[in-house]
Amino acid sequence: MSSPEGFGAAATGGGTPTASNTVTVTTYNELTTALSSKTTANSVILVSGTIDCNYFSVQLNNKTIIGLPGAKLRNLQITVGNSTTSAANSGILYIKSGSNNVIIRNLIFEGPGAYDVDGRDNLTNEGTNVWIDHCEFRDGMDGNFDIKGSADNTTVSWCKFTYLKAPIAGGSGGSADHRFSDLIGSGITDFPTDGRFSVTLKNCYWAEGCKERMPRARNAELHILNCYYKTSVSSARAIGLGAGNQGSTCYVENSNFEQIATISSPVNEGTGTAGLIFDNCVRGISSTAVTGLNYGTAPTKPSYTYTVLPVAEVAAYVSNASCGAGATLQVSSTGVISTNCPNTLGVNDNVENLDIKYYPTLIDNILNIEFSSIENGKAVIEIFSPNGSKVFTTSKNVTGNEKLELNIANITRGVYICKVQIENRVKTFKILKG
């Protein structure tokens, strides 16, 4: 994604990196100086290497933070047996209330491990119009990434959440295993100006070690799209939706709950109402549909424009170690971003529209696809069922103005999604098989 989709789509951060607006930081002092700066010269911050951090709270406006390959912000401070000291020294970055238009991409955030002492998170956001993309969050003391307070209009895309360190018991909070990843709304009376935290979670991966809060939310308007859940924690619980006093909705779409003990754990709290729906979601590679978990008044599908991966492809792409969720982007020393990903729907950062015509509207046996005069190359045509299963695929080297006649007589009647792709040019459309 070269720009955010979803509730955080308005985020532009500090703009495109240039020689005049970009600074590279390698130390904690350089990082905090650049974060605090309001000058144009520090609008885009490139993070290089591993930086050991203390907790830093800052108001950010029109700011972009990008990690160069392997960049990491970490705070490993912990004093087991001393809850007060551990809590005081915890946390990495807190985006304060009043922050607006912030982008953070391709960074690893690492904490000391889960320890229930009422400590801080690796990252906490109270800003508006925020895009967090291709980041990896590991071993937060209290949590990995929380959204609360005045935060609103946030998109979290291609992020990975994990716990690689064993949880630490005996903290003052009482939980022996506090690997609770992501909280949206800190209490039933915590909400932004318009009453609900509007958050899009797209192509995210809750991975090994996560136990709860994937996410836990109240007073929220959530869209969970193309996300992947795989953690061997025996008692793990994914989505915990509470109403809060303002009410909550959660639209879960084309997501794969491959390995998770409990997919949904409704929370009875507050004076509002809650509604959750699972649309075309599955449990693992067997593509067993997620059913029987909807409740409340069904939320409507978000009205904003967004791209969708077929659910059958979510596991492969989101968990891909070299081009999936996490800090997997390629970033040059000047801040130019690229990706290792193949040119696939929802994955490529630079997808363009393919110039084609297709007909008829109601197909009996033959689907006709006509390529314009400017199109040539290897065309890959794939057809997916509504649950994301691939039912047809073919490829052919085409030239300008060529027409393909595809015999799809063996496909059963119904609605399908067709994707046609030549290099980084893609066209997707619905077809009706009669």
Task: Spell out what each predicted region is.
Residues M1-S2, I337-N353:
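Low-complexity, Pro/Thr/Ser/Gly/Ala-rich linker/spacer regions in secreted
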Residues S3-I45, V391:
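Acidic Gly/Asp/Thr-rich repetitive segments characteristic of extracellular carbohydrate-active
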